[in-house]
């Protein structure tokens, strides 16, 4: 691999041109061994170009400075991007990463894919220092199939249409905490969906006979042959008793007095 240099800076970063000519390999050799140097540079170049995220151009019109109390002001200013709904940290006044100060200064002086390349290098150096694998592609995922193998065709619910066990349960609708969710099963072979099976009522002859016998005894002990209670009389109308008098509107003529 040819030597990698950071040489493209913006016009307002002329003060960092001395750092731009620094060989990346000479800088990285201060932190990592030569055995991990080539792999780290190759990985950082690949990931920085593949997962590069374009920075959002912020202006004063869409940035709102948040206010903090003096007891919470620890030297870090926060900005809120109201247009893009983002909150991020900027202008750190507390010195961080003093061990990697040279590399951090290069990150601050660059932009674009070169900045992402240096950030990946810094991340990889820290992982190597801690003895952790920095390349996520080399990390083996833990298989929990022995414990949570819920999609095993051996135990799946068979499809009533094609009798296949290549089915998947899906939660269609969630409801309140005291109500069961709406669950449907989808068959991957015939592309049909069906309701989950329900438990059938288990009937035991002995239990049924015993319950019927108990019900007979209860009806013999407590017969319900008593006559119904008499109907209560209808309440008297308040108008008939003179409790409510007829009213009239003020625009109407007053009622004539009975002589």
UniProtKB/Swiss-Prot annotation:
A zinc finger (TFIIS-type) spans 155-195. InterPro entries: RNA_pol_30_chordopoxvir-type, RNA_pol_30_chordopoxvir-type_N, Znf_TFIIS. Its main location: virion. One of its GO terms (cellular component) is host cell cytoplasm. It is found in: Virion; Host cytoplasm. Keywords: DNA-directed RNA polymerase, Early protein, Host cytoplasm, Metal-binding, Nucleotidyltransferase, Transcription, Transferase, Virion, Zinc, Zinc-finger. Zn(2+) binds at residues 159, 162, 187, 190. GO terms for biological process: DNA-templated transcription. One of its GO terms (molecular function) is DNA binding. Its EC number is 2.7.7.6. Part of the DNA-dependent RNA polymerase which catalyzes the transcription of viral DNA into RNA using the four ribonucleoside triphosphates as substrates. Responsible for the transcription of early, intermediate and late genes. DNA-dependent RNA polymerase associates with the early transcription factor (ETF), itself composed of OPG118/D6 and OPG134/A8, thereby allowing the early genes transcription. Late transcription, and probably also intermediate transcription, require newly synthesized RNA polymerase. This is DNA-directed RNA polymerase 30 kDa polypeptide. The gene is OPG066.
């Amino acid at each position: 691999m040819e030597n990698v240099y950071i040489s493209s800076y913006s016009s307002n970063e002329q003060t960092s041109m001395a750092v731009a000519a620094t060989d990346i390999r000479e800088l990285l050799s201060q932190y990592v061994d030569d055995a991990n140097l080539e792999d780290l540079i190759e990985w950082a170049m690949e990931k920085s170009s593949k997962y590069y995220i374009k920075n959002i151009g912020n202006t004063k019109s869409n940035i709102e400075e948040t206010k903090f109390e003096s007891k919470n002001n620890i030297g870090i200013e926060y900005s809120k991007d109201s247009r893009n709904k983002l909150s991020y940290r900027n202008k750190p006044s507390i010195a961080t990463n003093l061990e990697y100060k040279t590399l951090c200064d290069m990150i601050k002086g660059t932009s674009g894919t070169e900045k992402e390349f240096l950030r990946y290098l810094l991340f990889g150096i820290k992982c190597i220092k801690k003895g952790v694998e920095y390349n996520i592609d080399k990390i083996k995922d833990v298989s929990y199939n022995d414990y949570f193998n819920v999609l095993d065709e051996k135990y799946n619910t068979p499809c009533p249409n094609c009798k296949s066990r290549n089915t998947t349960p899906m939660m269609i609708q969630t409801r309140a905490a005291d109500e069961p969710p709406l669950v449907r099963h989808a068959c991957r072979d015939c592309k049909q969906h069906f309701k989950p099976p329900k438990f059938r009522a288990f009937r035991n002859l002995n239990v049924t006979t015993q319950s019927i016998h108990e019900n007979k005894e209860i009806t013999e002990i407590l017969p319900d042959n008593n006559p119904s209670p008499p109907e209560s009389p209808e309440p008297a109308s308040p108008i008939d008793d003179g409790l409510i008098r007829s009213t009239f509107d003020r625009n109407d003529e007053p009622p004539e007095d009975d002589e």
